[in-house]
Amino acid sequence: MKTEELSDREILDIVRPLAEHTENAWNEKCYSDFVRYFLDEDPAEHFPEEEFNRQIEENYDIYGKHTIADLVAIHRNPDHVIVLWKVDLEKRAEPGLLIYGFRKHNGQILIEGCSYHA
């Protein structure tokens, strides 16, 4: 993903819908939607549905739904971009942190990795 000529707004216009889709899939507890935009050609190999369900079971009751909030930073690399957002957590007053990596693959921008820290 060549980002040199893109503004922060242009980058966010491309990647935020992917992150929002993924967070909504987490909120709906839907594995297939969660991994839909992952770069990994076989997400089940590196992030199997069992691991998704384990994380839901461990964390959902504690934090509830995720809502992407304020932008923290955009880190540009020559071939990919990392975006950090605050994430509002339904069951906690303090926000968490979302970290998403995005990369262009076969003409499409996809999620290289994502995590949240609460």
Predicted regions and their residues:
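Short, well-ordered alpha-helical segments enriched in acidic and aromatic residues
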Residues: 27-41
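Short, low-complexity N-terminal intrinsically disordered segments enriched in polar/charged residues
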Residues: 1-28
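Surface-exposed, charged secondary-structure patches
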Residues: 54-101, 113-117
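Short, charge-rich amphipathic alpha-helical segments embedded
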Residues: 43-55
